């Protein structure tokens, strides 16, 4: 449920900021190495442990490497919740342990107009990423408690709306009332399985196949 909310927030945010239903630029994905046997593929909400190197496309200069700049240690992150670049969330789905990918990330899915550190504004980025481990993502009990304002173990439309408004404000997005209402209705249509007008703790924590 939490990951569906994040995906819904991201989709609406993109629409609002672009001013039209224009598709986002896509990441170019090249598989450099793939294991013969793959027991599990990454999906939204998974914890991933990776080594990576990042380069500027324009001149091939290295701006970060976990091997060189992170005491040689790989990094953990959660896929699909905007914890990392949008380009990573898009380009690292369906990946196997032992797989290596090269991602070409356009500015809109990287650091955009602002840039960051050694990365100039409007830079296309190249990442070589090696997946070392996949784990189940964090439990969503804490998120449910945060949303359940009256502690009745079920979420009303008002409670979900308040949560979404806070998440939008956290990311600096301004969305009008009608957008919030439409998003809440869409969430309840998908998550309120018994159609009683509330999302129960069970419905909230249930992991849907499409996630």
Curated annotation (Swiss-Prot):
It comes from the Eukaryota. Residues 1-19 form the signal peptide. It is an enzyme of class 5 (isomerase). A motif (Prevents secretion from ER) lies at residues 208-211. It is found in: Endoplasmic reticulum lumen. GO terms for molecular function: calcium ion binding; peptidyl-prolyl cis-trans isomerase activity. Ca(2+) 2 binds at residues 192, 194, 196, 203. Disulfide bonds join 38-96. Residues 45-135 form the PPIase FKBP-type domain. InterPro entries: EF-hand-dom_pair (IPR011992), EF_Hand_1_Ca_BS (IPR018247), EF_hand_dom (IPR002048), PPIase_dom_sf (IPR046357), PPIase_FKBP (IPR052273), PPIase_FKBP_dom (IPR001179). Monomer. Homodimer. Interacts with type III, type IV and type X collagens. This is Peptidyl-prolyl cis-trans isomerase FKBP14. It comes from Mus musculus (Mouse). The lineage of its organism: Eukaryota, Metazoa, Chordata, Craniata, Vertebrata.
